[in-house]
Amino acid sequence: MSAEPAVALRVPARALSITEEDFCAWLGRAMPRQRIEYHRGSLLIDRSKPLSPFSDKDRRELSAIANRAFVLAREGWLCLVQKRHGDFDYSYIAIIAARPDPAQRAQR
C-alpha cells in the first residue's frame, strides 16, 4: 500500500499576473491607497527553481517584481498584503502607501 501525499506541492503552471515593466508603470501613476495584484499563487514555490512551474525567464521576472515590491514596502512606499484562496494559492497585493505631504512632515 503506497501512501499518497496529503497535499501536492506542484501547482499547475500559471501565467504571470503582470510584467515588471507594467508593475513599474503602475507604480509611477498610482495614487495612495490604489492596489494591484502582482502575483497569484505561492511566491515561496513559484520563485524556487526546483519547485516553480514557471520557465526560468518567468521565474526570474516574478522574483524581480517581488523583490521590487519588498524594497518599496521596506522604504514605506507600499503596503504588501496577501489574500488566501486555498492551499498554495494566494493573491499578493501591493497598495500604494498614504504619505503625508512635505508640509505635514515638517510640522512634526
Language-model regions: role of each:
Residues 2-59:
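Short amphipathic alpha-helical interface segments
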Residues 7, 44, 84-86, 100-102:
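A generic structural micro-environment signature
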Residues 31-32, 73-75:
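Short secondary-structure junctions
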Residues 58-74:
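Short amphipathic alpha-helical interaction segments
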Residues 74-83:
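A short, conserved structural fragment
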